[in-house]
C-alpha cells in the first residue's frame, strides 16, 4: 500500500498535465485502493501499478518493477549481461516478425552473419512473436545450446541459420561507417538506436574520430529512426558534437527551464559538417527532441517520416521497494520556434521518404539514398 500511495501522490503533484488528460485521478485512487485492499500478489500489484500509470493515456509515462529497473540500470551502465545470440530486436507485428536493430560485436549472431535490418521469423520452429504480437524470450536459453533461426534479409527469401547461445555483455552497439555519394563525396553514417546506454555519446565520439582519421567528411547522417530516447545526459552529450549553447526550453506546471547544451565538443569539423537526420514513427522522446533541435536551429536537414509526437521529459521517481515510475513532467519548446508544439505535430521532415526498417538494407534504403543525393546537390 505504501508504494501505491507514493506513486499516486507523485503523479498528483508532479504530472505535466494538471487535468490528468481528462482522467479523474481521485477516482483512480479509490479504484486501485480497493483492489489492493482486496488482496493482490506481488505480480498482480505491480501489474496494477503499471495499468494505473498507463491509464494516464500519454503513451510515455511508465512504471517499472524492481526486476525491470535492475535491467534498465545495467543497460545505462553499459553492462548488459545475459545469455542469448547477441541481437537487439523490435517487434513488427503487422508482418509477424522481429527486426534486428543491433548486433553485438563478436556475438554468435554476428558470426552467423546476422545484420541490422534482417528479420527473425521463427526460433526452433516457434514464432518470435506471441499471439498478441509481443516479443517472446525464445532466443534466450542455456549457454552453449544451439537454436535454428529462420531469418530473412530484405529483398531475399527466408533461410535458416544455426546460432549458438553464449553470454552477452557490454554496451549497446553504435554502428557507423563512411558512405560514398554518387558524386564521390565522403559521408559519415551513425545509427543511434538509443540514449538509454550511458556509453552511447562516447561511442558516437569514437565513431567521429574513426571516420575522420583519413580526412574531413563532406556530410554526416545521424539515423534516429529507431531511437526511442533515453537519458538526458546521454542525449546532451551526443548533441554537443554537432551543436552547442541554448537549444530550447522545458516547461512544466510550475516553471520553465533552459536546455543549455554547454560547450561544443567539435571532432574534426563535426560542429560545421553538413548534416542529415533521419526520423520515423519509432523516433520517440529524446530521439525526437534531438532531431527537432537540429532541424529548428538549421543545423540539419531532416529526411524520413513524421514522428508520432512524444516529447515529454520523463522524470524518474524511485520507491522504497526498488520499483520506479517515469512520469511525464515537462514538455519541450524549441529555441527558434517556441510556438511549435511537437507533442501534437511530431517532427515533420523536410523531405518525406517512407522506409520501413525491415524492408530495406542500408544499401537499398530509400531514405539513405535521398540523404546521399542531398549532399551531392548541396
Per-region residue spans from a language model:
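C-terminal recognition in membrane/secretory proteostasis and scaffolding
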Residues: 2-13, 17-30, 34-47, 77, ...
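Solvent-exposed, polar/charged alpha-helical surfaces in well-ordered, non-transmembrane soluble domains
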Residues: 2-9, 26-30, 34, 43-54, ...
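Sec-exported extracytoplasmic/periplasmic mature domains
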Residues: 8-20, 33-41, 50-61, 105, ...
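Extended, small/polar residue-biased N-terminal targeting/export presequences
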Residues: 19-97, 146, 155-175
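Extracytoplasmic
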Residues: 40, 47, 80-86, 93-98, ...
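Conserved PDZ fold ligand-binding element
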Residues: 109-131, 221, 302, 339
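Cleft-lining beta-strand/loop regions that shape enzyme active-site pockets
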Residues: 110, 133-320, 374
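C-terminal regions of proteins
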Residues: 257, 265, 318-319, 327-333, ...
Amino acid at each position: 500500500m505504501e508504494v501505491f500511495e507514493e506513486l499516486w501522490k507523485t503523479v498528483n503533484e508532479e504530472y505535466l498535465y494538471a487535468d490528468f488528460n481528462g482522467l479523474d485521478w481521485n477516482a483512480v485512487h479509490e479504484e486501485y485502493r480497493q483492489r489492493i485492499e482486496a488482496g493482490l500478489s506481488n505480480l498482480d500489484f505491480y501489474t496494477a501499478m503499471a495499468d494505473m500509470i498507463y491509464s494516464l493515456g500519454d503513451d510515455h509515462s511508465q512504471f517499472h518493477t524492481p526486476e525491470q529497473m535492475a535491467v534498465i540500470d545495467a543497460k545505462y551502465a553499459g553492462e548488459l549481461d545475459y545469455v542469448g545470440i547477441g541481437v537487439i530486436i523490435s517487434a513488427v507485428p503487422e508482418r509477424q516478425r522481429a527486426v534486428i536493430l543491433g548486433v553485438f560485436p563478436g556475438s554468435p549472431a554476428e558470426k552467423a552473419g546476422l545484420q541490422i535490418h534482417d528479420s527473425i521469423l521463427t526460433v526452433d520452429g516457434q514464432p518470435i512473436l506471441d499471439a498478441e504480437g509481443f516479443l517472446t524470450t525464445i532466443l534466450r536459453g542455456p549457454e552453449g545450446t544451439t537454436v535454428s533461426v529462420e531469418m530473412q534479409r530484405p529483398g531475399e527469401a527466408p533461410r535458416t541459420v544455426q546460432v549458438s547461445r553464449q553470454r552477452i555483455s557490454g554496451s549497446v552497439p553504435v554502428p557507423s561507417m563512411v558512405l560514398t555519394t554518387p558524386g564521390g563525396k565522403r559521408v559519415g553514417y551513425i545509427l543511434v538506436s538509443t540514449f538509454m546506454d550511458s556509453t552511447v555519446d562516447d561511442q558516437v565520439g569514437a565513431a567521429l574520430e574513426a571516420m575522420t582519421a583519413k580526412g574531413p567528411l563532406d556530410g554526416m547522417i545521424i539515423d534516429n529512426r529507431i531511437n526511442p530516447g533515453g537519458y538526458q545526459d546521454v542525449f546532451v552529450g551526443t548533441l554537443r558534437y554537432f551543436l552547442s549553447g541554448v537549444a530550447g526550453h522545458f516547461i512544466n506546471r510550475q516553471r520553465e527551464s533552459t536546455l543549455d547544451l554547454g560547450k561544443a565538443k567539435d571532432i574534426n569539423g563535426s560542429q560545421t559538417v553538413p548534416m542529415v537526420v533521419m526520423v520515423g514513427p519509432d523516433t520517440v522522446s529524446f530521439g525526437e527532441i534531438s532531431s527537432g533541435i537540429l532541424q529548428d536551429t538549421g543545423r540539419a536537414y531532416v529526411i524520413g517520416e513524421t514522428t508520432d509526437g512524444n516529447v515529454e521529459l520523463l522524470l524518474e521517481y524511485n520507491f522504497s521497494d526498488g520499483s520506479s515510475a517515469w512520469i511525464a513532467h515537462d514538455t519541450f519548446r524549441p529555441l527558434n520556434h517556441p510556438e511549435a508544439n511537437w507533442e501534437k505535430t511530431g517532427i515533420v521532415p523536410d523531405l518525406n521518404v517512407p522506409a520501413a526498417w525491415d524492408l530495406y538494407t542500408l544499401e537499398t534504403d530509400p531514405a539513405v539514398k535521398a540523404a546521399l543525393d542531398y549532399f551531392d546537390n548541396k
